[in-house]
């Protein structure tokens, strides 16, 4: 087994990899090469996560679309099953019949 050197990614004592240090490019002076490297790293990270994000967006969109269609379908179903107006007509006929009965009874 080789002895770890200063350029190794894992610290020999703790066994942990060093973390990348966060920098603010607006405060710290960076060379154009460093800025270009940052852009390349960001682009690579974006391209790496793009398929997963696209898949999640598609699944979310399909889920929302299915929910909308389910609500829409249920609304049509419940309206077609509704007998509300029929009940009102029956009550109105009964009220007219009672009114005629009272009028003829007096």
UniProtKB/Swiss-Prot annotation:
TM spans (from-to): 58-78
Biological processes per GO annotation: mitochondrial cytochrome c oxidase assembly; positive regulation of mitochondrial translation
Mitochondrial intermembrane-side segments: 79-106
Cellular localization per UniProt: Mitochondrion inner membrane
Topology Mitochondrial matrix: residue spans: 2-57
Location of region: Disordered: 1-25
UniProt key word Mitochondrion: yes
Presence of keyword Lipid metabolism: no
Modified sites of kind N-acetylalanine: 2
Its membrane topology: Single-pass membrane protein
Keyword entries, A-Z: Acetylation, Coiled coil, Membrane, Mitochondrion, Mitochondrion inner membrane, Transmembrane, Transmembrane helix
Lineage: superkingdom: Eukaryota
Pfam families: Coa3_cc
Coiled coil: 78-104
Similarity field: Belongs to the COA3 family.
Subunit structure, interactors included: Along with COX14, core component of the MITRAC (mitochondrial translation regulation assembly intermediate of cytochrome c oxidase complex) complex. Interacts with MT-CO1/COX1, SMIM20, SURF1 and TIMM21.
Function: Core component of the MITRAC (mitochondrial translation regulation assembly intermediate of cytochrome c oxidase complex) complex, that regulates cytochrome c oxidase assembly. MITRAC complexes regulate both translation of mitochondrial encoded components and assembly of nuclear-encoded components imported in mitochondrion. Required for efficient translation of MT-CO1 and mitochondrial respiratory chain complex IV assembly.
PANTHER family to which the protein is assigned, alphabetical: CYTOCHROME C OXIDASE ASSEMBLY FACTOR 3 HOMOLOG, MITOCHONDRIAL (PTHR15642:SF3), CYTOCHROME C OXIDASE ASSEMBLY FACTOR 3, MITOCHONDRIAL (PTHR15642)
Protein name, UniProt field: Cytochrome c oxidase assembly factor 3 homolog, mitochondrial
Species of origin: Bos taurus
Gene coding for it: COA3
């Amino acid at each position: 087994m080789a002895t770890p050197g200063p350029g190794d990614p894992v610290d020999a004592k703790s066994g942990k990899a060093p973390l990348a240090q966060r920098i603010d490019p607006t405060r710290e002076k960076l060379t154009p090469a460093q800025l270009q490297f940052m852009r390349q790293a960001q682009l690579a990270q974006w391209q790496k996560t793009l398929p997963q994000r696209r898949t999640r967006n598609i699944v979310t969109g399909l889920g929302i679309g299915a929910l909308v269609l389910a609500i829409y379908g249920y609304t049509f179903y419940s309206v077609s099953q509704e007998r509300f107006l029929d009940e009102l007509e029956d009550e109105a006929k009964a009220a007219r019949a009672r009114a005629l009965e009272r009028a003829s009874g007096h």
